Amino acid sequence: MPTRSLPTFLTLLLLASIDWVSKLVVLLKSCQLSPHSSAFLYSYVWGHFSFLIIPSFNEGAAFGLFAQYKIPLLIFRVCVILGLALFLRIKYKSLHRRTRIALTLILAGALGNVGDILLHGKVVDFLFLSYYSWRFPSFNLADAFISIGTLLLIGHLYFTKESKKCF
């Protein structure tokens, strides 16, 4: 591995590890709850906004989609990870720094969720946001990495003059 791509690789491993450790902590803490305690591990309420840590499981893709296609979904996810990793490796020098950061975030999130599927057979979600009666589906840090990476990539592609140099 060239030394130029080493920071990207280490960042990828660090982010995936942070995701896995956060899920492990939530699962271990939820095992310590007594049957008579509330289902959430943490709550913060500010006016009509609330943030909760509630362990839940997702057997499908985003928002539980395609849960009935576990094996094809896993194969698709692994192919996406391998494709992204290969693309990042081959094009590393020619990619704009923002593109590398975005792809690293997406790849770290994908690795985090695939690690869950291989370990638990489903993805561990635990972050829950609500505002008034609006409730966002629960998610995890890997999902946040994927979302932030995607937004960075879209922002770079559409809103910068250098977007033609992106790939």
Swiss-Prot record:
| Membrane-crossing residue ranges in chain numbering | 8-28, 46-66, 68-88, 101-121, 139-159
Function of the protein: This protein specifically catalyzes the removal of signal peptides from prolipoproteins.
Q: Does the keyword Magnesium apply?
A: no
The molecular function GO annotations come to: aspartic-type endopeptidase activity
Q: Where in the cell is it found?
A: Cell inner membrane
Which NCBIfam families does UniProt cross-reference here?
lspA
PROSITE patterns registered for this protein in UniProt? SPASE_II
Q: In which broad location class does this protein mainly occur, judging by the first location in its UniProt entry? A: membrane
Q: What is this protein called?
A: Lipoprotein signal peptidase
Keywords noted in UniProt: Aspartyl protease, Cell inner membrane, Cell membrane, Hydrolase, Membrane, Protease, Transmembrane, Transmembrane helix
The family this protein is said to belong to: Belongs to the peptidase A8 family.
Record GO biological process: proteolysis
- Name the catalytic site residues: D125, D143
Q: Which biological pathway?
A: Protein modification; lipoprotein biosynthesis (signal peptide cleavage)
The protein's matches in HAMAP family, at most eight in alphabetical order, are given as: LspA (MF_00161)
Q: Tell me how this protein sits in the membrane.
A: Multi-pass membrane protein
Please report the organism this UniProt entry assigns to the protein. Answer: Chlamydia trachomatis serovar L2 (strain ATCC VR-902B / DSM 19102 / 434/Bu)
Q: Any one cellular component term from GO for this entry?
A: plasma membrane
Question: Which EC numbers characterise this protein's activity in its record?
Answer: 3.4.23.36
Pfam families from the entry? Peptidase_A8
